[in-house]
Design a protein with these regions (language model features):
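Membrane-cytosol interface segments of multi-pass membrane proteins
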Residues: 1-155, 259-261, 271, 284, ...
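Alpha-helical transmembrane segments of multi-pass integral membrane proteins
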Residues: 17, 23, 86-89, 150-159, ...
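C-terminal ends of transmembrane alpha-helices
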Residues: 26-31, 94-101, 155-167, 211-226, ...
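Interfacial loop-to-helix transition and helix-capping segments at the boundaries
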Residues: 42-55, 108-123, 161-179, 214-247, ...
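Hydrophobic transmembrane alpha-helices of secondary-active transporters
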Residues: 56-67, 179-186, 277
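Alpha-helical transmembrane segments in multipass membrane proteins, preferentially the mid-helix core
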Residues: 127-136, 180-193, 244-260
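Loop-centered beta-sheet repeat module
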Residues: 145-191
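Alpha-helical transmembrane segments and terminal signal-anchor/GPI-anchor hydrophobic tails
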Residues: 193-274, 281-290, 296-310
Length: 353
């Protein structure tokens, strides 16, 4: 986390990315995608791509800033505390609401990063531990070499797209490192040609992903083929070249915005990660979407009513995150006044630096 003031275009992208992630989870975990083919279900097919698209944009943003940053182990400790804090809070809420939790849920919530309770934050921690090495590589070469490196890595994405179910050289961490490489190069290279066409690229790729999802759904329904239906969102997967291209388009569309520094936007952007931790805990997920949000009541609702409910969920999450985060930050300040912890942090930083 950097203290210096950031321009708000990337922070606005951070907010946008989290909103589309939440909406993607709304239609997926809320069960809207599993309903009969309808206007609401067609709209859900559009929102479905937001999850992986938003995560890809988040990694691009991180790389954009970290490529010129120094490693700080305190950030890792703060991130681990934040992840575990939210996991424990949610498991307590689940206990209150349902009356029971398992021993596994309790232990894994306390040590959430170790047990990979949240896949995205765990992969991010791994990426943060490695980013100084990637920075050395990126900073060593000129623009021509870096663009060539990106070109040579394109087949890595295509392999996963062409061979359904392939895990060739894939893990959440390796994919984040791959995306980090792209985001770092975006900061170092002149990308004006891409930037000029970025909005067109984003819209075109989003439409292609949407149409492919609808098309495969229709084919699957008509042929009663569950295999086709199960892969209807294949083009919206995080390894899809279309998702990467769409994320690149979205990234540069926001990058070229000239909105200066807006403190309101920057303040809201700080809540994006807490929003993620609040709504996508696998142990709390069913309670949240089924018992609190109750998406099933809006499966067949008027389209405008559905939109209003989605907006209410998004706003509610940001408000809840602001309250929980206010409490967490105060606990964090107490924790990091420990002289012993600060000595450990200093020693780790010396090893990296």
């Amino acid at each position: 986390m950097q203290n210096k003031v950031r321009n708000s275009n990337m922070e606005l992208l951070r907010i946008f990315s989290m909103i589309i992630i939440v909406l993607s989870h709304y239609v997926y975990h809320g069960g809207l995608l599993e309903q009969e083919f309808s206007t609401n279900q067609i709209f859900a097919q559009l929102l479905k791509m937001g999850g992986k698209l938003g995560v890809t944009c988040f990694v691009f943003i991180s790389a954009y800033y970290l490529i010129e940053a120094e490693f700080k182990s305190k950030n890792i400790f703060k991130l681990i505390f934040q992840i575990s804090f939210y996991a424990v809070i949610l498991i307590i809420i689940k206990l209150v609401m349902t009356g029971s939790i398992s021993g596994t849920e309790s232990v894994e919530s306390i040590f959430a990063p170790i047990y990979n309770v949240y896949w995205f934050p765990t992969a991010y921690i791994g990426m943060y531990l490695v980013f100084p090495l990637i920075n050395i590589i990126i900073n060593k070469y000129n623009q021509a070499c870096l663009k060539l490196v990106l070109l040579l890595t394109v087949p890595f994405s295509i392999i996963h797209f062409l061979f359904i179910g392939s895990d060739f050289l894939y893990s959440n961490l390796t994919w984040f490192l791959y995306l980090y490489l792209w985001g770092g190069v975006f900061r170092k290279c002149d990308m004006q040609k891409v930037e000029k066409k970025s909005t067109v690229i984003a819209i075109l790729c989003a439409c292609l992903i949407w149409v492919s999802s609808i098309g495969m759904t229709l084919i699957g329904l008509k042929t009663a083929n569950n295999t086709i239906l199960s892969h209807a969102g294949y083009c919206a997967d995080i390894t899809s070249p279309l998702v990467i291209a769409c994320a690149i388009g979205v990234f540069f569309t926001f990058k070229k915005l000239d909105i200066g520094c807006n403190r309101i936007i920057n303040s809201i952007a700080k809540l994006t990660f807490p929003v993620y931790l609040l709504h996508d805990n696998p142990y709390f997920r069913q309670v949240f979407w089924k018992d609190i949000v109750r998406v099933e009541k809006f499966y067949d609702a008027n389209f405008l009513i559905l939109l209003l409910h989605m907006a209410t969920v998004v706003v509610g999450l940001f408000v809840a995150a602001s309250i929980v985060e206010w409490c967490r930050i105060r606990m964090e300040k107490l924790l990091f006044t420990s002289n012993y912890l600060n000595r450990v942090i200093d020693k780790i930083d010396k090893v990296y630096l």
